[in-house]
């Protein structure tokens, strides 16, 4: 299992979802996070490697509007989540 670390931005976005009371998104984030920790390159949420200025990062769908954007560090067995609110192109 990979260890999950959240960026400050991802923490703020998770707090936003928590305060919004949207249980469907919170459940999806939990499910995706568990799946990412187990196997970061495959699984649910349509994992895909990102391109161009986001090369080296991966994305998984929370829903049509939101994505989890993360990087995988195999040497330290860690996944670093950069963001989870909005589509990565809105940043």
Predicted regions and their residues:
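Residues that recognize and position ribonucleotide moieties
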Residues: 3-4, 43
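A short, compositionally biased N-terminal segment around positions ~18-40 that is enriched
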Residues: 19-39
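A short, surface-exposed loop/turn module that caps and links secondary-structure elements
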Residues: 34-61
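Enriched for short, Lys/Arg-rich terminal
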Residues: 3, 9-26, 59-67, 71-91
């Amino acid at each position: 299992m990979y260890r999950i670390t959240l960026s400050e931005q991802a923490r703020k976005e998770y707090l936003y979802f928590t305060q919004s009371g949207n249980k469907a998104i919170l459940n999806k984030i939990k499910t995706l996070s568990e799946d990412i920790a187990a196997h970061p390159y495959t699984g649910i949420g349509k994992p895909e490697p990102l391109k161009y200025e986001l090369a080296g990062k991966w994305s998984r769908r929370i829903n049509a509007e939101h994505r989890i954007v993360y990087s995988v560090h195999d040497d330290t067995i860690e996944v670093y989540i950069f963001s989870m609110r909005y589509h990565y192109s809105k940043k």
